[in-house]
From Swiss-Prot:
Record keywords: ATP-binding, DNA damage, DNA recombination, DNA-binding, Nucleotide-binding
Record NCBIfam families: PRK04301.1, recomb_radA
Species this protein is from: Ignicoccus hospitalis (strain KIN4/I / DSM 18386 / JCM 14125)
Annotated CDD domains: archRadA
Task performed by this protein: Involved in DNA repair and in homologous recombination. Binds and assemble on single-stranded DNA to form a nucleoprotein filament. Hydrolyzes ATP in a ssDNA-dependent manner and promotes DNA strand exchange between homologous DNA molecules.
Lineage summary: Archaea, Thermoproteota, Thermoprotei, Desulfurococcales, Desulfurococcaceae
Gene that produces this protein: radA
Gene3D superfamilies to which the protein is assigned, alphabetical: 5' to 3' exonuclease, C-terminal subdomain, P-loop containing nucleotide triphosphate hydrolases
Pfam family, one: HHH_5
Similarity comment: Belongs to the eukaryotic RecA-like protein family.
Protein name: DNA repair and recombination protein RadA
Ranges that cross the membrane: none
GO molecular function list: ATP binding; ATP hydrolysis activity; ATP-dependent DNA damage sensor activity; damaged DNA binding
Length: 327
């Protein structure tokens, strides 16, 4: 009687990886490395910082990457991957078209503009829309509801607005609010710690949208002046890097909002620019400037995206949320 060949059992949790005992697993989970995906994009130095020996850290990361088949891909494979990215509708066809179909997963999308330009409105709308079925522009599949995390740094979140937007879409407002995890970040360290914790929450709760509104306010307030610029940019860079990891590893959309400041040296054209310096110029995959227009209309302009042309679109902020203008 012949023997039946069996496939080698592949690790499905951090505790099953080679070199990971109970105490090491506890350290990894406490530090936000509770999944194989999170370990695969970690660096040995990051694991050493939480008390894991360098050789063990290298072994763990190597094993995690093998499990996820992290390797070189052909350009054609990359094309197919990008074509399969999911997108969340903004509620406005004009704006969706500008963004190439909506707010895409595996990407940080930055909306920046002056007060009242619609940044937080878009964040609220996306937090509702992500819960829609795929065929309606959301990321929910069957009984698996896509959820959102809303990190609020300026106190701009309004549950009343979520309720209003949900009702207009024919959704149960209480269910919609149950699927949005809200947290108020009180300072930059707290903000960074929240994002670290998301490496555990995102896969566990099927979070498909992470909102940070706004990403720069605490960093600017706590590190003013040129003498603190290097420290501020270093911390902000690490924060954005972690958000990018979350987007990539868990196929999640990330929206960050940002403020603008006036440039006194600009005499022609738009004298405003997003705050955050070069760190924020390069971290987001899509950067969109928002401007006020007449009445409830707003103008969105793509200023940087490798796959999108520089272009503008007009959308409206209505009682029901983000929509196309009526005229």
């Amino acid at each position: 009687m012949g023997q039946v060949a069996t496939e080698e059992k592949r690790p499905t949790s951090v505790a099953e990886l080679p070199g990971v005992g109970p105490s090491t697993a506890a350290k990894l989970i406490d530090a936000g490395y509770g999944t194989i995906e999170a370990l695969a994009v970690a660096t040995p130095e990051e694991l050493v910082a939480i008390g894991i020996p360098l050789t063990t850290a290298q072994k763990i990361i190597r094993a995690a990457r093998q499990m996820l088949d992290i390797r070189f891909r052909t350009a054609k494979e990359v094309k197919l991957e990008r074509m399969n990215l999911r997108k969340i509708t903004t509620g406005s066809k004009n704006l969706d078209d500008l963004l190439g179909g909506g707010i895409e997963t595996k990407t940080i999308t930055e909306f920046f503009g002056e007060f009242g330009s619609g940044k937080s409105q878009l964040c609220h709308q996306a937090s509702v829309n992500v819960q829609l079925p795929l065929e309606q522009g959301g990321l929910s599949e069957g009984d698996k509801v896509a959820k959102a995390v809303y990190v609020d740094t300026e106190g701009t979140f309004r549950w009343e607005r979520i309720e209003q937007m949900a009702k207009c879409l024919g959704l149960d407002p209480d269910q919609v609010m149950d699927n949005i995890y809200y947290i108020r970040a009180v300072n930059s360290d707290h903000q960074m710690a929240i994002v670290e914790e998301l490496f555990n929450l995102v896969p566990k709760e099927n979070v498909k949208l992470i909102v940070v509104d706004s990403v720069t306010s605490h960093f600017r307030a706590e590190y003013p002046g040129r003498e603190n610029l290097a420290v501020r940019q270093q911390k902000l860079n690490k924060h954005l890097h972690q958000l990018g990891k979350l987007a990539e590893v868990y196929n999640t959309a990330v929206i960050i909002t940002n403020q603008v400041m006036a440039r006194p040296d600009v005499f022609y054209g738009d004298p405003t620019q997003a705050v955050g310096g070069h760190v924020l110029y390069h971290a987001p995959g899509v950067r969109v400037q928002l401007k006020k227009a007449r009445g409830n209309k707003r103008i969105a302009r793509v200023v940087d995206a490798p796959h999108l042309p520089e272009a503008e679109a007009v959308f409206a902020i209505t009682d029901c949320g983000i929509r196309d203008p009526e005229d």
